[in-house]
A protein has these predicted regions:
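Glycine- and small/polar-enriched repetitive beta-structure motifs of secreted/surface proteins
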Residues: 1-255
């Protein structure tokens, strides 16, 4: 008794079954696209195996081969790109609100919610992590359990990786900003290569191209301006409390 359904391709929507009159507005295009949907509505699934495990899930968009291919009961997801959100799987009805656009973007997400990934391999290792934004190729690409990170730019926070659930509150915006950060938290790094050598360092602010670009383990530094504190480098964990504001400000400071 389902109405307003479009199914194109081998096995597309072949298990959909409404026993009462229902306007489904489901669209499935591709071999086995939406093949397991039973009573879900308002889904748009385009591509081979797109959303093929979804059952009673609603308001999903999956475009691309094996996009959103594992999930059964997750709703309100947008997966555009080959294998985008390919392993997301909610075993209970959940509004995930995950958005992944790009080849394998958010590919490893299982039960994380409210993440936004735009770019090839963006956030592709995250599993049960929430409230992240990764925009740019390989942005936030290594992390598994870090939450509340913002990485915008090619390779931003590329090596950040928390293996236990952690709210990182890291913000990195710019080409390879915070590129080497592993387990540092609460860093704000804005500008091309800003803080790009920092690893397990915390509470830093680097704003400007190449600001704080050499330091690995210094914490609590503020560098604002192009190349500010760009020679500072502490190889052991150190609270520096250095502040440099201006073009090349403190550029000769090392330790």
């Amino acid at each position: 008794l389902g109405s307003h359904t479009t199914a194109i391709g081998y096995g597309a929507l072949n298990t959909q079954n409404f026993t009462t009159a229902t306007d489904t507005y489901n669209t499935a295009v591709g071999s086995l696209a939406g093949a397991s949907v039973t009573t879900g509505i308002l889904n748009t699934l385009i591509g081979g195996l797109a959303g093929d495990a979804l059952t009673d899930a609603d308001h999903n968009v999956a475009i691309g081969y094996q996009s959103l291919t594992t999930d059964t009961l997750g709703s309100r997801a947008i997966a555009i790109g080959r294998e985008a959100l390919g392993t997301q799987n909610f075993a209970t009805a959940t509004n995930g609100y995950n958005v992944a656009v790009g080849m394998q973007a958010g590919k490893a997400v299982t039960t994380g919610v409210q993440n936004t990934f735009v770019g090839a391999l963006a956030g592709d290792a995250l599993t049960d992590a929430d409230f992240n934004v990764a925009i740019g190729m390989q942005a936030l690409t290594a992390d598994t359990l870090g939450s509340r990170s913002i990485a915008i730019g090619h390779g931003a926070l590329e090596t950040q990786n928390f293996t236990t659930a952690t709210d990182s509150y890291n913000v990195a915006m710019g080409f390879k900003a915070g590129n080497a950060v592993t387990t540092g938290v609460e860093n704000t790094l804005i500008g091309g290569l800003a803080g790009d050598a920092l690893t397990d360092a915390d509470y830093n602010v680097a704003i400007g191209s190449e600001a704080l670009s050499s330091d690995t383990l210094g914490s609590r530094s503020t560098a604002i301006g192009r190349a500010a504190l760009n020679s500072q480098n502490f190889t052991t964990a150190t609270n520096t409390h250095n502040t440099a504001v201006g073009f090349n400000a403190g550029s000769n400071v090392t330790t």
